């Protein structure tokens, strides 16, 4: 769900920098990759990590599972989510509330671009605003893909998607 994956990403960053200490790194993820990107963003990353781009990520594992239980099945959080979170803690070493992109974004000082489709029926579009508002500083931006479903912003926006991403990155990278 992104929480343990952030540690893998940190190792990949170290590997890249061992190959090229002057590399400029952008972390860009879609869906679960977006969650991993945001969860990594709250960690202490080297100065060569310049920008984070998240596309249709969620606020926390707890929030997305709670939303899915309600929307898809009409079920409350208790007892299912509490039991599943306790099981995850026992098996994976973390609970669902701990795996929070929202908390990690609050610790992120580096630039971040938030992207989301308005017709996403998996990750609520409103989560983008919550995440954006949690990110400190002014080095942040949003890109809304009108009518785009989950993970469809790239397809719906076409060149606008990539032009926005590259323009945002260009503000913070040497070249």
Annotate the PLM regions.
Residues 133-152, 164:
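Catalytic histidine neighborhood in serine/cysteine hydrolases
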Residues 101, 110, 124-133:
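Short alpha-helix in the alpha/beta-hydrolase fold that links the catalytic acid
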């Amino acid at each position: 769900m992104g929480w343990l994956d952030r540690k893998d990403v940190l190792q990949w960053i170290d590997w890249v920098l061992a190959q090229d200490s002057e590399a400029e790194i952008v972390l860009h993820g879609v869906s679960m990759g977006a969650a991993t990107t945001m969860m990594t963003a709250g960690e202490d990353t080297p100065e060569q990590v310049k920008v984070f781009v998240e596309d249709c990520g969620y606020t926390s594992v707890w929030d997305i599972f709670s939303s899915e239980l309600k929307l898809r099945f009409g079920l409350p959080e208790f007892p299912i989510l509490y039991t599943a979170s306790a099981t995850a803690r026992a098996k994976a070493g973390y609970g669902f509330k701990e795996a929070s992109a929202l908390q990690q974004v609050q610790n992120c000082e580096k630039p971040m671009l938030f992207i989301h489709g308005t017709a996403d029926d998996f990750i609520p579009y409103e989560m983008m605003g919550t995440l954006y508002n949690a990110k400190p500083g002014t080095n942040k931006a949003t890109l809304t893909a009108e009518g785009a479903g989950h993970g469809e912003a790239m397809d719906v926006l076409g060149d606008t998607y990539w032009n926005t991403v590259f323009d945002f990155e260009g503000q913070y990278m040497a070249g």
